[in-house]
Every structure is written in C-alpha cells, then in structure tokens.
UniProtKB/Swiss-Prot annotation:
This is Glutamate dehydrogenase 2. It is found in: Mitochondrion. GO terms for cellular component: mitochondrion; plant-type vacuole; plasma membrane. The gene is GDH2. It comes from Arabidopsis thaliana. One of its GO terms (biological process) is amino acid metabolic process.
C-alpha cells in the first residue's frame, strides 16, 4: 500500500469514528489545488534539461497552506498528495493556524552543481510564485532542500511581490530565519517522546534507543537523548549502521560523520547490517528516514516497546496491525515530527511581527505546544477508545472539519 492509500485509509477510519457526513468527508479528501510544472534549465555545460515540479495545496480551512519542498528522484504526484494531506492533519494536531501543502521536484540534488540547483529553484519559483504567498501557501525545506534553497525562493518571489520574508520558513538566520529552527524537528521528537514515556511512568534517562537515519532529525534527536541520559545503542544512515550495547558517544559520532561523511569506521561501535537495525533490541525505536520501512516482513521481529515516528509514514498499515497486536506503542508521525512545522509557524509569526525571539523562548514554546498536543491526543483516545494514531487523526480531522463547517464549505 503506497503512502496516499495509507493516508486515505487512516483519514476514512478517523472520519467513521467521528461520524462525519459523507459530503464533508469527500470535501476534506480532495486537494484544493494540484500544480504540475515543467522546469527547464541550462546545465553548467550548456545543455538544456527539463524537470517536473509539483505542488499540492490540500486544505486552507484553518489558515495558509504549509509544507515542505523536496528534491528527490522518486518524487511523484501520489507521494506529494499524501504528504500534503498529512500536513493538513499535522498542523491541526499541533493547533497552529495552517492548512497543508507539499511540493517537490523529481531530481537528484547530488548530481546537480550548486549553480544548477539555484537555477532550478528559481525557475520553479517563477512557475508557482502567483500560487504561493504569506497568507496563501508557505513552503519550507524538506528532503534534499535546505535554508539556502529557501533563500533562493525568497529572493525570486520578492522580485515579483516585494520583500516578503514570511513567504518561506526554514530560512538562514540572516534572512529572517528563526533561532532553534535547525534543531526543531529533532527537538520536537524528543519532547514528544518525553510526553509519551511520562504517560507510562518512564523517562528518557536509562532507556535504550535505536535511531534509523542520522540526517538533521536523527542527529538532533540522538544528541538530545544522549544529553538527557538516554542510551543510544544503534544508529544507521545511508552509509551504514553501527551498534554499541554500552551506548554510542553521539558527540563523537557526529564529529566522525562531519569529518568523513560516513558512519563507517567509527571506533566507538561495531558495524552491523542496516537491515537488522529496526529489529535491534531496545526500549524505543525512532525511524527518522524514509517511509514504509516497517512492514509485514519485519514488524513481527521488532523488539522495541515504543516506536516514535520521526519520519513520515514509516509504518505501513500491515505493520501497524502486527505491532499493535504485539502491544507495541506507536507515536504517530502527524504528531511526533510536528516540531519542525511548529517552529516554522514561530518563524512566520516573527517575520510578520518584524521581531526576533530568543532561542530559549522558541524552545520553551515548542515544548508547550508538543506537550499540549499529546494531552489532546490522549483525550481523543479516551473519548473514542482508540490508539494514539487514531487519537491524532481524529483530533486533526475534527478540527479541520469544524473549520470547514464554520466557513460553510461542506455543501
């Protein structure tokens, strides 16, 4: 089952639990707008190459649409559609005044020079500039994009609309980015994990963690867990996987990866098969990489007691069912990785105010939002006798449905 089918399935389940009218259910499932554009650029050698770009604007009942732009060879309309829909529910779960969107270009950033990436980003912005905006649709970085990408979008958009720092988030600090934004998703994962563990009378200190993915999110999550006394016993990324039953020195591992670009040959742990990482012995498993990594083939062998979905859609529906029957507690992606979009909201607010917050304020506000959202999810779980995933979906879908009805859009 692909990401779109799984997302639609979760939405329909939440809709049935809430008893939504069929008209509003249909309205909430159909995207507001789907955009597909051709982006032709000259390569550094002068040859012309065309790429296909997408932007799906799913829903704006609760506010401007919000979501990342990813550069990846496997970007396709179904994936972008699913992720846009997830953003609608995610922003509602976090209770920030946004709807959902997502975008992407089917390209391999590693195969493009910096100047080629800039040209591609600017052409994409030229194609969609009149369909995004401060109060319309606010992009952000995602897989394969970063603060520099957002700077190019800001600059190109501003040529048409005047200086508009709030049109994108995840920007460099010097162009109106927020302090704390770089660590926000990983820090939010840790705040979410703390809220979950507290529900079971536990804390991060002394527990064992396995982290799949050592990019921005995985690195920050591992670093903060390490600082709070958690024992990270295994880590993987695209280059390989390592384990240490006594706990990995995360700061040393970060230095090693910064120096070598790889986890391989790190002397603070033993190499392991990446395929075995997800079934490694631990208290908490945190998938921070791609979707669909937990499936019916490996779910039965998972040994973790808790799974915190830092990645989007890491657990397919078959695995979800298997893990639930085993008693594994899953903290769903539409809540667990909402730290990034929450601090993006803080950045947008700061840009509109023309005022910059201290990093301590950003982190305290993030903790407040993540903790409050968890308790709201638990309330829905108790009300509807459902698991955390459906608690989060019913919370998000209900908020969007209410906004839709209040606007009179459901007819």
């Amino acid at each position: 089952m692909n990401a779109l089918a799984a997302t639609n399935r979760n939405f329909r389940h939440a809709s049935r639990i809430l008893g939504l009218d069929s008209k509003i259910e249909r309205s909430l499932m159909i995207p507001f707008r789907e955009i597909k554009v051709e982006c032709t650029i000259p390569k550094d050698d002068g040859t012309l190459v065309s790429y296909i770009g997408f932007r799906v604007q799913h829903d704006n009942a609760r506010g401007p649409m919000k979501g990342g732009i990813r550069y990846h060879p496997e970007v396709d309309p179904d994936e972008v559609n699913a992720l846009a829909q997830l953003m609608t529910w995610k922003t509602a779960v976090a209770d920030i005044p946004y709807g959902g969107a997502k975008g992407g270009i089917g390209c391999s950033p590693r195969d493009l020079s910096l100047s080629e990436l800039e040209r591609l980003t600017r052409v994409f912005t030229q194609k969609i500039h009149d369909l995004i905006g401060i109060h319309t649709d606010v992009p952000a970085p995602d897989m394969g994009t970063n603060a520099q990408t957002m700077a190019w979008i800001l600059d190109e958009y501003s040529k048409f609309h005047g200086h508009s720092p709030a049109v994108v988030t995840g920007k460099p600090i010097d162009l109106g980015g927020s302090l704390g934004r770089e660590a926000a998703t990983g820090r939010g994962v840790v705040f979410a994990t703390e809220a979950l563990l507290a529900e079971y009378g536990k804390s991060i200190q002394g527990l064992t963690f396995v982290i799949q993915g050592f990019g921005n999110v995985g690195t920050w999550a591992a670093k903060l867990i390490h600082e709070k006394g958690g024992k990270v016993v295994a880590v993987s990324d695209i280059t390989g996987a390592i384990r240490n039953p006594e706990g990995i020195d995360i700061n040393a591992l970060i230095k090693h990866k910064d120096a070598t670009g790889s986890l391989n040959d790190f002397n603070g742990g033993d190499a392991m098969n990446s395929d075995e990482l997800l079934i490694h012995e631990c208290d908490v498993l945190i998938p921070c990489a791609l979707g669909g990594v937990l499936n019916k083939e490996n779910a039965g062998d998972v040994k973790a007691k808790f799974i915190v979905e830092a990645a989007n859609h890491p657990t397919d529906p078959d695995a979800d069912e298997i893990l639930s029957k085993k008693g594994v507690i899953i903290l769903p992606d539409i809540y667990a990785n909402a730290g990034g979009v929450t601090v993006s909201y803080f950045e947008w607010v700061q840009n509109i105010q023309g005022f910059m917050w201290e990093e301590e304020k950003v982190n305290l506000e993030l903790q407040k939002y993540m903790t409050r959202a968890f308790h709201n999810i638990k309330t829905m779980c108790h009300t509807h006798s459902c698991n955390l995933r459906m608690g989060a979906f019913t919370l998000g879908v209900n908020r969007v449905a209410r906004a839709t009805q209040l606007r009179g859009w459901e007819a």
